[in-house]
Amino acid sequence: MCNRARPNPNNDAVYSLSINSDTHVMKPESATLAAISVGAPTFSQEAVSRAIEAQFGLIGEYSPLVSERDQNFMLRADDGGHFVAKVTSGLEEAAATDFQVEALLHLEVKGGLNVPRAVRTKAGETFGEISDDNGSYRLRVVTWVDGEPLESQGLNERSVCNFGAALARLDKAFAGYTHPGENPALLWDLQRVLELRELIDYISDSSARKSVTQAADDFENRVLPVLGDLRYQVIHSDANPGNILLADDRIGFIDFGDIVKAPLVFDVAIAMSYLRSFDANPLKFMVPFVAAYHAVNPLDAREADVLFDLVRARLTTTITLLYWRLSARAENDAYRQKALEVESGAGRFLAILDSIGRSEFREKLAFIQ
């Protein structure tokens, strides 16, 4: 039973970040890096509104939303409906976009989950289209999910228990879903963490750079050899507190743009990497979260054995891309600013995990055998 606890204000601890003065913007050398370097499309609100009205039949008030790759708007329709309109990144493969839409349709059939629903065009299609001088872009609409982001409310034992159980139900619903586009080229995919080694030099803080290097080495030496022993399925892959919505005790999930087929335990580790406590008990949110997940969708010992290195690998991804983004995107870039605000505690928490060590971490999860 999860007892309500007072939110810990220290969860929002931030430390300053800077980049070396001689750091230059990296020219993308791979599809994965290019996908997050170019920013979202930049259609005018009026152009999107016209396209949505013509193809989806929705009219209303638009407000821009911050996004890494897609151009998103909140749409309050005149008929009372509440939606998100999405102009998909021009670098995203059509198969990857279809994978995301079909995933939402799959979850809708499963039922019982608080997730967006795909809205079809007037012609019954799952995509529309919007064009400019640079070409055509896929246009989507999904329903709005009510609730406040977990990141804005502070963590407590009750909320993380609800989060863990809800993520377990989501993963169970995803089991059995397959699609030709289930392996998109995304640097946020934890399976690609070793590709980030080429960006580690962007980390100007020597202590953080050392921790990230060690975490990447540990992933290579401890996780890669056992990946074949783990359960694979489609996972959300980005269950961070900004994508987790809380309305009373009901959990909602948004942003399915990073879904991928990967080891199931990756979904647990990714979520854990954001359940940070900076007081005397750094794991006080992680352990009840895992226990709640395990009660609904049991993990096995092999999965629990790699959680320490997987959490550190996700923090490595977060830290490396944060420092790289400082140089790769303009200072007034909205996603860059949001990432700085939300993620600047990742390096500090990675150092805390390093001090705890693999053995003590695993002992805290001894209920998984």
List PLM regions with ranges.
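A cross-family kinase active-site recognition segment
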Residues: 150-208, 232
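An alpha-helical support segment within catalytic cores of ATP-dependent transferases
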Residues: 41-54, 176-180, 194-237, 298
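ATP-binding pocket architecture of kinase catalytic cores
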Residues: 78-178
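Active-site acidic catalytic loop and adjacent metal/ATP-binding pocket
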Residues: 68-80, 84-85, 118, 220-266, ...
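Juxta-kinase regulatory segment immediately upstream of eukaryotic protein kinase catalytic domains
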Residues: 24-58
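Active-site activation/catalytic loop segments of kinase-like enzymes and analogous catalytic loops
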Residues: 265-298, 312-330
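ATP/Mg2+ or Mg2+-diphosphate-binding catalytic cores
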Residues: 202, 320-369
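ATP-binding glycine-rich phosphate-binding loop
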Residues: 57-73
